[in-house]
């Protein structure tokens, strides 16, 4: 049995049936399942997408520069992570958000070195 897992959630999955914005029911559903696994002793790392809020490549069609569009997509990922972490905490499980781009005090900075 594995003790550590990496879970990838698409941004669209956090947007409910429409796949846009943040759907509280979707966040609650995922959080309950994640909390149940964590309470059973599983260590879970979660990577969220941000496509429910903004997709960098689709920004090109709207006049956004590729690099700026990608940056907005990364911010969307952080927004989703903050939302999901709050719902996980509401289930009584510790949750932290990390970013390789310094954004303190919003989220903790991660640097593998």
Predicted regions and their residues:
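Surface-exposed, active-site-proximal loop segments in enzymatic domains
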Residues: 19, 58-65
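General structural feature for long, well-ordered alpha-helical segments within catalytic domains
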Residues: 1, 5-6, 26-33, 60, ...
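Ligand-binding beta-strand-loop-alpha-helix segment within the catalytic cores
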Residues: 62-113
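Short, active-site-adjacent cap segments at secondary-structure transitions
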Residues: 13-15, 51-56, 104-105
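N-terminal glycine-/serine-/threonine-rich phosphate-binding loop
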Residues: 1-43
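Short beta-strand segments
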Residues: 6-10, 48-49, 98
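N-terminal active-site beta-alpha-beta segment that forms phosphate/nucleotide-binding
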Residues: 29, 36-37, 43-44, 48-57, ...
């Amino acid at each position: 049995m594995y003790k550590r897992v990496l879970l990838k959630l698409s941004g669209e999955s956090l947007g409910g049936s429409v796949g846009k914005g943040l759907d509280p029911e979707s966040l609650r559903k995922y959080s309950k399942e994640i909390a149940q696994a964590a309470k059973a002793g599983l260590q879970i790392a979660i990577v969220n997408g941000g496509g429910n809020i903004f997709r960098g490549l689709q920004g090109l069609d709207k006049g956004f520069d590729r690099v700026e569009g990608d940056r907005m997509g990364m911010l969307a990922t952080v927004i989703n992570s903050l939302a999901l972490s709050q719902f996980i905490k509401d289930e009584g499980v510790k949750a932290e958000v990390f970013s390789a781009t310094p954004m303190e005090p919003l989220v903790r900075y991660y640097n593998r070195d």
